[in-house]
């Protein structure tokens, strides 16, 4: 059984690049959701800063494999190339260690 990884990505966008950041990211998310290692992702907008997008992602691979392979996929090249110009500060990854999981119980 493959161990899943989960992480949070913070994308603090420039106010003038809000729509471009969002539309560029959606294209990447649409493509990455077809990857065999992909489990899920949830895109959020920060309640404190509407220019900041936050992703919660889960993948069925190691963190090292994700960084070495998934960030270099052809469909990400354009996005990764222009990302720095869309952000007011650097993108950050927050890696998570699962402590315990809960799922809704059907009644």
Tell what function each PLM region has:
Residues 2-5, 42-51, 80-107:
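Glycine-rich beta-strand-turn "strand-cap" elements at beta-sheet edges
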Residues 27, 33-39, 58-94:
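An amphipathic, aromatic/His-enriched active-site/gating alpha helix that lines ligand/cofactor pockets
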Residues 16-17, 47, 75:
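Alpha-helical structural elements of signaling/regulatory helical domains
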Residues 17-19, 63-65, 101:
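Residue-level signal for secondary-structure boundary sites
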Residues 12-22:
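Short, surface-exposed ligand-recognition loops at beta-strand->loop->(often short) alpha-helix junctions
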Residues 5-12, 40-71:
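Short, well-ordered beta-strand segments in beta-rich or mixed alpha/beta enzyme
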Residues 6-9, 13, 28, 100-101:
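Small-side-chain structural scaffolding
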């Amino acid at each position: 059984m493959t161990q899943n990884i989960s992480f949070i990505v913070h994308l603090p966008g420039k106010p003038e690049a809000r729509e471009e950041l969002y539309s560029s990211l959606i294209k990447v998310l649409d493509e990455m959701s077809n990857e065999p290692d992909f489990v899920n992702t949830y895109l959020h907008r920060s309640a404190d800063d509407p220019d900041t997008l936050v992703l919660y992602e889960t993948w069925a691979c190691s963190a090292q494999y994700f960084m070495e392979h998934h960030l270099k996929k052809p469909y990400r090249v354009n996005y990764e190339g222009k990302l720095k110009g869309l952000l007011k500060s650097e993108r950050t990854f927050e890696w998570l260690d699962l402590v315990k999981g809960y799922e809704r119980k059907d009644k």
